[in-house]
Regions:
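Beta-strand-loop-alpha-helix segment that lines the small-molecule cofactor/substrate pocket
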Residues: 64, 70-71, 75-122
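Short, Asp-centered acidic motifs that coordinate Mg2+ and/or phosphate
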Residues: 31, 63-64, 144
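N-terminal Rossmann-like dinucleotide-binding module
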Residues: 1-44
């Protein structure tokens, strides 16, 4: 049983992480750090709402931390979790620079910990269909690929971390990894 905690119980925690962790018999959803509301306890009775990230990391019951916070915080949260001896799954975009990614990879290896990047579109039907057609020999070698993934909004997102002009923000970091 892998005791797991989320860094956030916002949209990605509620939709992409908690339901799958709770449904898998190999995982135990222990709780989440929630800066404002305490929704995880209401949604998943028996879980804990941590008051700080430090409190979450200090919990010796936690084996795995899912870092699902704004992109610009990933490096610091992942590094802190690894230094605390926790395995980590981090949402895309993993880090803002390749140097940060390399540092985290080296730290995880040095400490004998697992570090993985979560990419939620990996098993979407379009990608699985292409993979199947290639493996069955239905289509040959690719010379060029164009994939379109769009998001249209008439207004900027109220989530400042997605629309601001800062490292880790904007469409390239938000949608580019898909």
């Amino acid at each position: 049983m892998i005791n797991t905690a989320l860094v956030s119980f916002g949209m990605s925690g509620k939709v992409f992480h908690a339901p799958f962790i709770a449904a898998n018999p190999n995982f135990n959803l222990v709780g989440s750090w929630e800066r404002s509301t305490k929704n995880i306890v209401a949604t998943y009775p028996g879980t804990k709402s941590y008051n700080s990230y430090e409190e979450l990391l200090a919990d010796s019951n936690i084996d795995l931390v899912v870092v699902n916070s704004p992109n610009d915080s990933h490096f610091a949260y992942v590094k802190s979790a690894l230094l605390a001896g926790k395995h980590v799954v981090c949402e895309k975009a993993f880090t803002n620079t390749s140097a940060e990614a390399q540092e985290l990879d080296e730290l995880a290896n040095k400490k004998g910990l697992k570090l993985a990047v979560y990419q939620n579109r990996r098993y979407d039907a379009d990608f699985l269909t292409i993979q199947k057609l290639i493996s069955e020999g239905e289509i040959g070698d690719f010379l060029d690929v164009q994939i379109s993934f769009e998001r249209y909004r008439t207004t900027l997102s109220p989530k400042k971390h997605k629309e601001s002009v800062t490292p880790g923000a904007g469409l390239l970091y938000d949608l580019g990894p898909h």
